[in-house]
Amino acid sequence: MREKIKLESSAGTGHFYTTTKNKRANPEKLEIKKFDPVARKHVTYKETKLK
């Protein structure tokens, strides 16, 4: 089953994206480069728990 996750910016701006992932197929934490509109550049987003 796909679970909801939060991708939080490593730039420290507080910006985040929400998405889903299959935890059985990909148990490791997701780390992806995406655009941060607050910092106005591409930064690394790391998976955190969605509360």
Curated annotation (Swiss-Prot):
MF annotations from Gene Ontology: structural constituent of ribosome
Cellular component aspect of the GO annotation: cytosolic large ribosomal subunit
Biased composition (Polar residues): 10-20
One GO BP: translation
Region described as Disordered: spans on this chain: 1-20
UniProtKB keywords: Ribonucleoprotein, Ribosomal protein
Family annotation (HAMAP family): Ribosomal_bL33
Family according to the record: Belongs to the bacterial ribosomal protein bL33 family.
Protein name: Large ribosomal subunit protein bL33
Organism: Nitrosomonas europaea (strain ATCC 19718 / CIP 103999 / KCTC 2705 / NBRC 14298)
Gene: rpmG
